């Protein structure tokens, strides 16, 4: 394996993103091990690890050659971005837009291959991939816009998706017009485009991960609050639930979704059915 350049400040700055991505991927993996019913956490872990691999392959050239190494790096970035988009959409109960994600990802990779092997042009490769990633970000924003009962984390992810799309499209266009075009990789990793790309990616990836951490923590808290007022066997109110019932009936300190869950006719009928089933099992 050959190093792209000397171990200087530029390389050390470049290693910041893979380090952050590896750490975030490990955290999401641990969360998934404790919440196996949330497969999107495993997808997030894999996405961050693929992102780390993509950044490392930008600085280290494999024995297969520079062009195949760059293609492998961009492939890692594309799969990571697609997985991240799908995981965020899944987290909020939306159907994953496989057609839109697949079209944007495949179009970006196809354009990259064209301007890498058929008509070599580094500037167009940069534009093609950034436009594809910007499109993926806007797809996520469009899906989050129609989520019902949006809370702070949903709004934060929606804003971050818009900022990410703006970062990929507007920032790239401004810098390429101001400092481009780029003819080769000589000096590219010290350019203003690459420096801003590293810093913006590190910031946005951290903010997105923190938002998803908060969302996962809120899910656990809601589950614990619901379980604190119910009996796991019968589904009825437990002692704590009965003790708090007078306060709830007076409208003071109601737990989340208490009335909708326990006072609806459907819920009452369901609990009666559960009690009858349990009694039949005891008699049998």
Predicted regions: what is each one?
Residues 2-22:
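Hydrophobic transmembrane alpha-helical segments in integral membrane proteins
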Residues 22-40, 53-188, 195, 211, ...:
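Juxtamembrane segments at transmembrane-helix boundaries
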Residues 40-48, 195-198:
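Juxtamembrane helix-loop boundaries in multi-pass membrane proteins
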Residues 195-210:
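Hydrophobic alpha-helical transmembrane segments
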Residues 224-226, 239-259:
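Short regulatory alpha-helical coupling segments
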Residues 226-244, 265-278:
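Conserved nucleotide-binding and Mg2+-coordinating catalytic segments in signaling enzymes
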Residues 245, 282-284:
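Active-site-proximal alpha-helical element of nucleotidyl cyclase-like catalytic domains
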């Amino acid at each position: 394996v050959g190093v792209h350049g000397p171990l200087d400040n530029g390389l050390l700055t470049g290693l910041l993103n893979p380090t952050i991505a590896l750490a975030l991927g490990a955290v999401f993996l641990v969360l998934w091990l404790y919440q196996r019913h949330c497969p999107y956490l495993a997808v997030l872990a894999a996405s961050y690890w693929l992102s780390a691999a993509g950044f490392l392959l930008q600085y280290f050239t494999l024995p297969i050659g520079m062009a195949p190494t760059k293609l492998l790096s961009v492939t890692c970035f594309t799969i990571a971005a697609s997985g991240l988009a799908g995981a965020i959409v899944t987290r909020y109960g939306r159907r994953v837009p496989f057609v839109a994600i697949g079209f944007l990802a495949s179009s970006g990779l196809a354009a990259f291959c064209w301007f890498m092997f058929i008509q070599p042009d580094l500037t167009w490769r940069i534009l093609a991939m950034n436009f594809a990633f910007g499109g993926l970000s806007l797809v996520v924003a469009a899906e989050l816009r129609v989520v019902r009962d949006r809370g702070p984390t949903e709004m934060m992810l929606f804003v971050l998706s818009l900022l990410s799309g703006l970062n990929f499209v507007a920032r790239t266009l401004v810098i390429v017009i101001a400092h481009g075009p780029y003819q080769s990789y000589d000096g590219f990793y010290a350019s203003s485009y690459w420096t801003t790309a590293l810093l913006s990616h590190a910031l946005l990836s951290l903010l997105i991960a923190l938002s998803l951490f908060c969302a996962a923590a809120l899910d656990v808290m809601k589950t614990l609050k619901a379980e604190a007022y119910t009996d796991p066997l019968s589904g009825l109110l437990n002692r704590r639930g009965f003790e708090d019932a007078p306060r709830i009936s007076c409208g003071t300190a109601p737990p989340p979704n208490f009335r909708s869950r326990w006072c609806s006719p459907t819920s009452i009928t369901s609990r009666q059915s559960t009690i009858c089933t349990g009694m039949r099992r005891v008699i049998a």
